């Protein structure tokens, strides 16, 4: 999909960027790769997830990641630590996993309790096992287009755009949000794909005017339906990385009702970005296992 085709997209004909369907398709490919690793090395790719405390939402996310591992034949090592865990104790556990040759990827579930230095703990993860793309070194290497595992949500979004043959070069992209694991890496990945990128945030003046000129809009700000449908430029590609539970299921950071009559393509909520985030984590763990085995 080129700039010209985006501009000429007929009303009501927006492509649904179905992350759930694509993730299922990729899982079949990953299962084959996992089987090949087992056959050639006698070892099973494994992802270690660390959950500190008893936050219900975090526990749900960790369980979903474990289920995804199981579906492709990987091992899932679940490490649970109490809320009172110190930064030093958590870093020691990460070191233990770094030094375990049977662990190919490490995920520290965000957020950790407030008294823990989360950034220091992220930085403790060995770059070769940073399959969630959370280290500063990994971010820097990605930004400089060197080999590294990308932060999973933006990397999953890029996979989704690539799958739908959306040509990014030359597009005006607006990323709303500047978090270390979503907004900033998303902007850098789009820049590396030759987009002209604007990052908006809580201090941005006149957000609407920025959205109205964007060929690609990425909602990554964590505020329910902050970005209104009538701000969207005709033919734009709309990516909603937010999720906020409601009585009717959930909404994202973008008001999606009516977007199908404006955009050329958009991600549904749920079923768009979320499945691709977990899928990318699993894919990058398989990549790490193959590299570890020299395959």
Curated annotation (Swiss-Prot):
Q: Which Gene3D superfamilies match?
A: Leucine Dehydrogenase, chain A, domain 1, NAD(P)-binding Rossmann-like Domain
Q: Which Pfam families match?
A: THF_DHG_CYH, THF_DHG_CYH_C
GO cellular component assignments? cytosol
Biological processes per GO annotation: L-histidine biosynthetic process; methionine biosynthetic process; purine nucleotide biosynthetic process; tetrahydrofolate interconversion
State its Enzyme Commission number(s): 1.5.1.5, 3.5.4.9
Concerning InterPro entries, the annotation shows: Aminoacid_DH-like_N_sf, NAD(P)-bd_dom_sf, THF_DH/CycHdrlase, THF_DH/CycHdrlase_cat_dom, THF_DH/CycHdrlase_CS, THF_DH/CycHdrlase_NAD-bd_dom
Q: Which domain of life is it from?
A: Bacteria
Single GO molecular function? methenyltetrahydrofolate cyclohydrolase activity
Per the record, what are the reactions this protein catalyses? (6R)-5,10-methylene-5,6,7,8-tetrahydrofolate + NADP(+) = (6R)-5,10-methenyltetrahydrofolate + NADPH; (6R)-5,10-methenyltetrahydrofolate + H2O = (6R)-10-formyltetrahydrofolate + H(+)
Positions that bind NADP(+): 177-179, 202
Pathway(s) served: One-carbon metabolism; tetrahydrofolate interconversion
CDD domains for this protein: NAD_bind_m-THF_DH_Cyclohyd (cd01080)
Its biological purpose is as follows: Catalyzes the oxidation of 5,10-methylenetetrahydrofolate to 5,10-methenyltetrahydrofolate and then the hydrolysis of 5,10-methenyltetrahydrofolate to 10-formyltetrahydrofolate.
Subunit architecture: Homodimer.
The text of the family note is: Belongs to the tetrahydrofolate dehydrogenase/cyclohydrolase family.
HAMAP family hit by this protein: THF_DHG_CYH
Q: Write the protein's name.
A: Bifunctional protein FolD
Q: Which organism is it from?
A: Psychrobacter arcticus (strain DSM 17307 / VKM B-2377 / 273-4)
């Amino acid at each position: 999909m080129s700039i010209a085709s985006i501009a000429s997209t007929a009303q009501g004909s927006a492509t649904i960027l179905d992350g759930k369907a694509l993730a299922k398709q990729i899982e079949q490919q990953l299962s084959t790769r996992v089987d090949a690793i087992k056959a050639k090395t006698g070892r099973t790719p494994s992802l270690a997830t660390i959950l500190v405390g008893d936050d219900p939402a975090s526990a749900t996310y960790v369980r979903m990641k474990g289920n995804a591992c199981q579906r492709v034949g990987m091992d899932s090592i679940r490490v649970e630590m109490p809320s009172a865990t110190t930064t030093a104790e958590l870093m020691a556990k990460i070191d233990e996993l770094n030094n375990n040759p049977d662990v190919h990827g490490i995920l520290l579930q965000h957020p950790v309790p407030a008294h823990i230095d989360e950034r220091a703990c992220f930085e403790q993860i060995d770059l070769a096992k940073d399959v969630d793309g959370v280290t500063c070194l990994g971010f820097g290497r990605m930004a400089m287009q060197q080999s590294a595992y990308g932060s999973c949500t933006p990397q999953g979004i890029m996979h989704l755009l690539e799958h739908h043959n959306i040509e990014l070069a030359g597009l005006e992209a607006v990323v709303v949000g500047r978090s270390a694991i979503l907004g900033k890496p998303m902007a850098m990945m789009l820049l590396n794909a030759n987009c002209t990128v604007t990052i908006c945030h809580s201090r941005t003046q006149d957000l609407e005017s920025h959205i109205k000129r964007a060929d690609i809009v990425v909602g990554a700000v964590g505020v329910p339906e902050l970005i209104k449908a009538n701000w969207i430029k005709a033919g734009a590609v709309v990516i909603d990385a937010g999720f906020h539970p409601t009585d009717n299921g959930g909404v994202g950071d973008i008001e999606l009702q009516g977007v199908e009559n404006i955009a050329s393509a958009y991600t549904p909520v749920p079923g768009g970005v979320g499945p691709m985030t977990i899928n990318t984590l699993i894919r990058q763990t398989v990549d790490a296992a193959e590299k570890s085995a020299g395959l």
